[in-house]
């Protein structure tokens, strides 16, 4: 039995259901600390925030602080997560969590440390790269485990901006590190892969010690680090937390926290058993390295915190790969350009995992299978599909959980397109508006029935996806406008659509079935806050309806969570049906994340 992290929570912290905000010291970000990155985990049940002083991990809904790490040197409180197993060694871990300015690939999962040197021309922005700073510019979670990907950032970076840190939060120290010649812009994690996004490259590593480089893909200039990774579809690799019980949720008694024990002794490796060199190079857990951030609900089981994959729509393709190949080739000829006649296969027995990123040309999206069956140790080469999605550069893209659908928007921000990753066929084309906008976030709902889109105009759109129009994903049943009956008919169309022939494309567009301008709520939020917070919001450009970047996550299939960087607030919007059988987005609750 291993003593896992237990998290201090405040049972009196309530989410707001109106325009009155309450603050709690256990859920706050310092006023003087700028949020640098917000990312949800793979099932969107948690989200992580990195800022100028460290990082935090929250449960998504209900919002609840799970982890708080403060990297400020000589700070009175370096963390606010109760972990008695580390004891007095926690401060030493904070002082020694950097691998040094020379760069390295290291593993700290066992007593035998493996180190591999890398040369780099970059040093830490804070000086020698010894970790004397505190800013975390990027954070990515690996489901609910204790492994997080960190990159230094902000005015005083904790780590060099060209260095990827795999942080073991159970030991509060660096587990792996990778250093590059250019800044690391984004990191995507799965249980078998580490995806590193550079300015013009995507590098795929195995999640092992030391990490093994599998593939490198060149891209168009990608300063925003745009990329997305689906959840690994191999069922045998999904259940990391098979020993998690309903009793593992922590209990609060008389203001004290009861610690929780987890048994991970049955788990030996983060890599699956069929992974190359898994016996010698995997990150060994040894019963001590892996823990989870449990859901606050005491009735939540292990399967609730693990993304489960269903492959029902793909059954026809898997059963008859020859037919599927022919269909994919024909479709790609008329709609897109593809580098392979073989479609991406997402069978139940495969280890399929979709990686999507901008291609080498403007408006192109490259789709690659980076699953565990594709690595340099075998003769199996990854299937690569190219989708010509837009005429302008890609600004935002997202995959559904199974990696069968990809939604994308260009820098114009007026049109949202959904393609099949297997056949590259265009399935839907939605219109956001007629004026330019920056799409800041997009997410599919958990059941792939809806797509939520958020822009810099603070408008949240939700589009309905009619799955009955592409049951076999072969292209023949697809549609370019998202209409035609079923659930897709909820989306709005222009009144003249279908009445007159040869209408311009604008009149044939499909619009979201519900939307909301979040500014109408933010204006009242500003009025209810203190004068000091009002001045801060105005200084950040948010008080007068200025630009703020929100990040979307789904809570269920009818509730959308938005986390705002500058305003530092959490919001929950719910899709409700009105009396006239229309749909609307209502803000049901919100909470400030700053003090």
Curated annotation (Swiss-Prot):
Keywords: Cytoplasmic vesicle, Membrane, Protein transport, Repeat, Transport, Vacuole, WD repeat
Topology in membrane: Peripheral membrane protein
Any one Gene Ontology BP term: protein transport
Region listing for Disordered, in residue ranges: 1-28, 76-132, 264-342, 467-490
Described function: Involved in mitochondrial or peroxisomal functions and amino acid signaling pathways.
Protein family: Belongs to the WD repeat PROPPIN family.
The protein's name: SVP1-like protein 2
